Swiss-Prot record:
Residues 8-80 form the J domain. It holds the Pfam family HSCB_C. GO terms for molecular function: ATPase activator activity; protein-folding chaperone binding. InterPro entries: HscB, HscB_C_sf, HscB_oligo_C, J_dom_sf. Interacts with HscA and stimulates its ATPase activity. PANTHER family: IRON-SULFUR CLUSTER CO-CHAPERONE PROTEIN HSCB. Keywords: Chaperone. HAMAP family: HscB. Gene3D superfamilies: DnaJ domain, HscB, C-terminal domain. Belongs to the HscB family. Co-chaperone involved in the maturation of iron-sulfur cluster-containing proteins. Seems to help targeting proteins to be folded toward HscA. This is Co-chaperone protein HscB homolog.
Length: 177
């Protein structure tokens, strides 16, 4: 078994290069590849073969890690398309989005400060629904329209949303302990 370490992750797993993927097919492909390249299968071979199997296994695991999460999959698709999402340098967002984020954060802080677990859970549910809607827009931008600048902006938006979801989770955990 030889894996081309230069092929993209979608090709590695036999998946179409799209945002919308069959996640169960991805997992099945990952399990299949893991069975073929797992270092234990090469333990009796010379060191060079052991190192090669470790490289293959690392590549397979990294590919699975990137493709199984929608946000990292979107970032990877942008990278493959030659689009720099400028995640670290471009934090400019629309005033409407920033206002929305401030409102979300204020609501989370108020619920946390008041110890309102039910309110935090409701905020979490509403944010999860909002996240689904934004993901759907991202899928449309990447798969249907090929609008990479819009997709890059949506990726940056989703990073804010994901961070807020973690803040709600942390607040819930703090209140429940």
């Amino acid at each position: 078994m030889a894996i081309d370490l230069q092929q993209d992750y979608f090709s590695l797993f036999g998946m179409p290069r799209r945002f919308r993927i069959d996640e169960s097919a991805l997992e099945a492909a990952w399990h299949g590849l893991q069975g073929e390249v797992h270092p234990d299968r090469f333990a009796h071979l010379p060191d060079v073969e052991k190192r090669r199997s470790m490289q293959w296994a690392t590549r397979v695991n990294e590919g699975f890690r990137v493709l199984r999460k929608p946000l990292s999959r979107a970032q990877y698709l942008l990278e493959l398309a030659g689009v720099d999402a400028a995640i670290d340098t471009n934090t400019a967002m629309s005033p409407e989005f920033l206002m929305e984020q401030m409102e979300w954060r204020e609501a989370v802080e108020e619920a946390r400060a008041a110890g309102e677990v039910d309110e935090l859970e409701q905020l979490h549910l509403r944010l999860r629904q909002h996240s689904r809607e934004v993901h759907a827009g991202l899928a449309d931008a990447l798969d249907d329209a090929g609008d990479y600048p819009a997709a890059a902006e949506t990726v940056r938006r989703l990073m804010f949303i994901e961070k807020l979801q973690h803040e709600i989770d942390d607040a819930l955990e703090a209140l429940e302990n």
